[in-house]
UniProtKB/Swiss-Prot annotation:
Tissue expr: Widely expressed.
Name recorded for this polypeptide: Programmed cell death protein 5
One Pfam match: dsDNA_bind
Chain positions found as Phosphoserine: S51, S119
Matching Gene3D superfamilies: PDCD5-like
GO MF annotations, alphabetized: DNA binding
Length: 126
């Protein structure tokens, strides 16, 4: 019993130390993610005009997956030189429509009706 308690205390202490000091691997990963986010933002700032950036940030609040797809599309177009100048709000709307058509989900509803033994004899008619 003492061994189990000692092991539990060791695990708790180890968890406290890791939480306090942080894992060095996590710090490197967070720094890499932060650099990537800064690079994405700088590319998008060069590619989009003010109104398009505002629309994209509003979309990010509602649909983050779609925003990520549009950002990736814009960054890819910028890297390959397919953009001539900054993308306006109207251009962003057209890109959003293209992405929406590509990722459109078809929903189907299937009714699964259960067959229940129902007898009217048990029901009391009032």
């Amino acid at each position: 019993m003492a061994d189990e308690e000692l092991e539990a205390l060791r695990k708790q202490r180890l968890a406290e130390l890791q939480a306090k000091h942080g894992d060095p691997g996590d710090a490197a990963q967070q720094e890499a993610k932060q650099r990537e986010a800064e690079m994405r933002n700088s590319i998008l700032a060069q590619v989009l005009d003010q109104s398009a950036r505002a629309r994209l940030s509003n979309l990010a609040l509602v649909k983050p997956e779609k925003t990520k797809a549009v950002e990736n599309y814009l960054i890819q177009m910028a890297r390959y030189g397919q953009l001539s100048g900054k993308v306006s709000e109207q251009g962003l709307i057209e890109i959003l429509e293209k992405v929406s058509q590509q990722t459109e989900k078809k929903t189907t509803v299937k009714f699964n009706r259960r067959k229940v033994m129902d007898s009217d004899e048990d029901d009391a008619d009032y």
